[in-house]
Amino acid sequence: ATVRTVNARLARMGRKLGPDPASEIACTIGGVIANNSSGMACGIAENTYQTLESATVLLANGEIINTDDWDSDAQLKAKASDLYQTLGQIKEEISARPDLISEITRQYRMKNTMGYGLNSFIDYSSIIDIFLHLLVGSEGTLGFISEAIFNTVPLLTHAATTLLIFENLNAATEALTTLIATNPATIELMDCASLRAGKVDMQGIELNQHAALLVEYQVQEESELSAVMASAAEVHAQLGTVNQAQLTTEVKTRSEIWHIRKGLYAAVAGARRSGTTALLEDVSVPIAQLASTCLELQSLFTKHGYDDAVIFGHAKDGNIHFLVNEDFKDPKLAERYRCFTEEMVDLVLSKGGSLKAEHGTGRMMAPFVERQFGAELYAIMVRIKEAFDPSGILSPGVLISTDALSHMRHIKFNPPIQKVADNCVECGYCEPICPSKDLTTTPRQRIVLQRAIATAKSNGDHALLAELVKSAEYHVEETCAVDGLCESSCPVGINTGILVTTLRTERNGTIYANVWEQAAQHWGATLTGISMGLNVARLIPSQIIEALNRSLRNYLGSEKVPLWSKELPKGGKPREFAASDKPDFVFFASCLESIFEAKTAESLKSLSRKAGLAFTTPPTISDLCCGTPWKSKGLVDGYKSIVEATYKSLVKASEDGRLPIVCENSSCTEGLIQAIKSRTDSKLRIIDSIDFASEFLLPNIEIPKKMNSVTLHPTCSSTLLGSHTSFETLANAISEKVSTPLDWGCCAFAGDRGALHPELTASATKAEAAALALEGEDFDAYLSTNLTCEIGMSRATGKGYQHILVAVNELARSRRS
C-alpha cells in the first residue's frame, strides 16, 4: 500500500499518516518505515519514528517478533538472546556517558536518517521499544517488517497557500525565522534554477537570482482560517518580497502552486541528457546555517560544472534537496562526481548538519556515516548491525560499509532507449494506477526492461538479449492496456502505452497488418460480420464454440483471436444515417454498439429529443471509427486510413466545426480527440456524451423520482478527458446516494485486450470488485461511461453495469411535457 491509498481511507475518519512525503503517490508503507520518511509538514514531530506504534518483524535468524504482543519483550529475549543482551549493554553504556547523550541529542534535533537511530537508546527504556525504533530507517539491514501499526494524526482539511518570491536565496532564507513564527504547516524553498525548471509565472519579473518560499497554513476548522490568513498576511507584507503574493484557499490555484514544487525533481531529471543518471541528494542543517549552506552549495555546482543543478526542499526544517545529473560511463565525469561529493560532505558537516535527512543512508552515503557521527558512535552502529545480522546476509553494504568508495561502485547506468520513454526517472509514480501491476509489469518496469534490453545489446550478451526480448512479448507488450493513465501520473508526461504500441508495430507481421488495412477499407462490412458471428455463436452449444475458439487461439495465437465467453452481449446493429434540417450537434455513434448490443446510443438520442435538441450524423457513419483498434495494436497504415476517412466525414457533417461532435462511449471520444490532435488547422470540437449531457441535456429535462443509490466506475478515458465532475453531476441528478469505490481503476478491457487476455482484466478489476463486495450494499444501478468497461466490470463483479445515460434516460422526462 502507498501513503496515498492509506490516507484516502483514513480521510473518511478525519485522520492521516504522520509522514507526508511529496512522493506519497508512490511511497509504500514499507519504504516509509525503512527510510524513516518524513516530508513537507511533519518535520521530526510526526515522522515514522515518532508515529510507529508496533511492527511484526522477521529476524535474520528466522524468528518472528510482533512488538504489539503483550509479552514481546520476553519473546525477543527468548528468541534472540544475544541481540537482546547487546541492546541492553549499549543502552547502559550510552546512559553512563553524558557526552554521548549530548552528541546524539544534537544529531537528532534536526532531520537525520544517517546510520541507525541511536536516539532510540535515549528516548526509550524498554529493550523491545529500542528494538522497534532501531528498525525504523534501517533500510532492510536489520530485519524484514511484514506488518506495522501507526498512530495517526488529525487531517487538517482547510488550507491557505502562497508563493513568496525574493530577490535572492539569501533574502529568502533570512525570512525563515520570521515565517516560522507564524506557525505554517510547510515552508518549501526553491532556488532560481528550480523556478526556471518549474516554469514559474514570475508576474512580469525577469528571473535573475530570485528564490521562492512556498508557504502553507493548515487548520482543522474553516472558521479558524480567516484569522490565520489575516495574521500571516501582515507578516508577509513586511518580508520584502518582489511579488504581490496573496494567500489563497482556491483549490485549483493551490494545486498549481504545489504542482511546481512536487514536479521539480522530475522536471529537472526528466530534462537531463540521454544516458545520464539523475542523483537527488538530501541534507539538513540548523536553520541558522541554511543560507550559507545553500550559497556554498551553489558555488560547488559552479566549480564542478553542474550547471543544471537545483536546490529545493523543506526549509522550515533546514532540510534541502539538490539534484545533479552525471554521466558515470565517462571516468573523468565519475571522478568529478566523487570530488564533488567529498566537498559537499565536508560542507554539510562543517555546518553541523546531517548528510541524510529523510531519504535514508543507502549505499551512496554509507562511506560517510563514521565521518558524521565519529568513531565511537559509529562503532556502536557496527555492533548493532552485527547483533541483528551476525552473518551479514541482510542488505550487505547498505548503511554500514567498510569500502570508502562503495558509493562509486555498481552505479546504475541509463542507456538510451526509445525517445518516448528515454527521460523516465523511474520514480514509480505510474505504478499504483497501472492495471497490469499485479499481473506482469508496470510502466516503470516496462521501461526498465527496455533499458536492460539495450544494455544486453550493447554488451553483446546475445543469450540474455534473446531471453529478455522473449519475456517482454507477454510481460511488456501483450498485457499492457495502453490506457494512457500512466501519463496522467507521470511527472515528465510519459505515456508508456505509446512505447508499447511502437513495440507492437515492430512485431506485427505483414499479413496481419494487411488484414487490418483491409478492415479499415471495409469497416462497416467487418462490423456486420463480427456482430453476426456473435449472434451465430449464441445458437451453437457453448462447448462446441469454446473448443473451436481454443483451437483457433492455439493456432493463431492469443494476440490474434479473442477468447469467446457466454457473458458477451449479443451482436449489435449497423449504425444508420440520421439527418436534421437544423441540427444542434453531430452524433458520432461509436462502432462498439455495432459489435455489441447496447442501449447507450439510443438513450442519447432519446435524451436529446426530450431536451429539445436535434442531431445529425455523418452520411457514411457505418464505415467510420475513431481508430483506436488500429492505434492500440500498432497498425500504423490502417490507423491512418480509417482516421483520414473519419476526419473528412466529420468536417463535412459538422460544417467545418460549427457543430459540436458528440460520442457516446468515452474511449471513442478520447480516441477521436487523439486522432485530430496533430491537425493544427482543425476546428472540430469533440465532446464526450456525459459532458454534453451534463451541460446541455440535464438543464432541459426533469427527473421526477431518484433512485436510492448508485455506484460509479470511472473509466481511464473519462479520467483522461477530465469528465469525472460531469459523471458525478449526472449521478447526483438521478440518485440520492452516489459512491465511487476507493479502489476503482482501469478495468483493462481496453477494446479487445480483455477478450484477448482475460487474465489482465481479472487482475485489474480484483481490488475494485473486492471493495464493492466489502461494502455489502446492493446498489440500484452500477454505472460507467464506456461499453467494454461495462462488460469488464460486469464480468468482475457479477453486477449489471450500464452506461449512465441509459439510467438517466429511463428516469428523465422533458421539461416541456
Question: PLM ranges: what are they?
Answer:
Residues 393-398, 429-452, 479-506, 671-672, ...:
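Iron-sulfur cluster-binding cysteine motifs and their immediate structural context
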